[in-house]
Amino acid sequence: MHAVLLDFNGTMFFDTRFHMEAWSEIYHELHPEDPNPLDPKLICGPCNESIIQNMAPWLNADERKQCSERKEELYRRMCRRNPDSLHLVAGAEKLMQGLHERGIPFILASASIKANVDFYFDSFPIGKWLKKEDVVYDDGTYADKGEMHLEAARRLNVPFSECMVIEDSVAAITLAKRNGAGQIVAIGEKADGSDLIQLGAA
């Protein structure tokens, strides 16, 4: 592989529970009549715009944006309330240093919004290896994570077919495979990743 495209949430930083708690609060504000817990499959992978459209199709564009910003504020607050969990996954720094030493270009392609990217650069030592301005994030111009992968490869000037994609969600891995990623590596918080392997991840 000639380049590596790194996801962040759920791969470099195990934060699924914080996202889940924040989305759950948003969901039950929008659906106070529903006592059931939020299905994790509804929020893992798609960008905020898609999640909110599915969750509350009656909201207009401005309301969806406000909803997205509120969800991320809740998420960051939950992260700060749990400082013991606010660290990179074991091996993440070693991976980035190893890629740097070998001259293999790598980049973050995250479904996070800009405010979260700023939060990550403030909270983790990733600035040692990555430039914030190079990060591909959810700025509202990408239809899905697959488009983010392709943009990340373009920024590195490497064909997507020669890129390794490191992801944790079924949706993102499915898109990476469909778009012809050279290699897909699945990393996740759960020990059993058989569902991701079946999709073509290593």
Regions found by a protein language model. Name each.
Residues 22, 51, 116-119, 175, ...:
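Phosphate- and divalent-cation-binding pockets in alpha/beta enzyme and binding domains
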Residues 39-44, 69, 128-143:
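A short, structured active-site edge motif that brings together acidic residues
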Residues 11, 18, 114-115, 171, ...:
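Conserved Rossmann-like nucleotide-cofactor binding loop
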Residues 28-30, 55-58, 93, 97-107, ...:
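Substrate-recognition/cap helix-loop segment adjacent to the acidic, metal-dependent catalytic center
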Residues 2-90, 102:
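N-terminal helical cap/lid subdomain that shapes the substrate entry/recognition surface
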Residues 164-202:
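Acidic, Mg2+-coordinating phosphoryl-transfer loop and its flanking beta/alpha structural elements
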Residues 143-170:
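Conserved Lys-Pro-Asp/Glu-containing loop-to-beta segment of HAD-superfamily phosphomonoesterases
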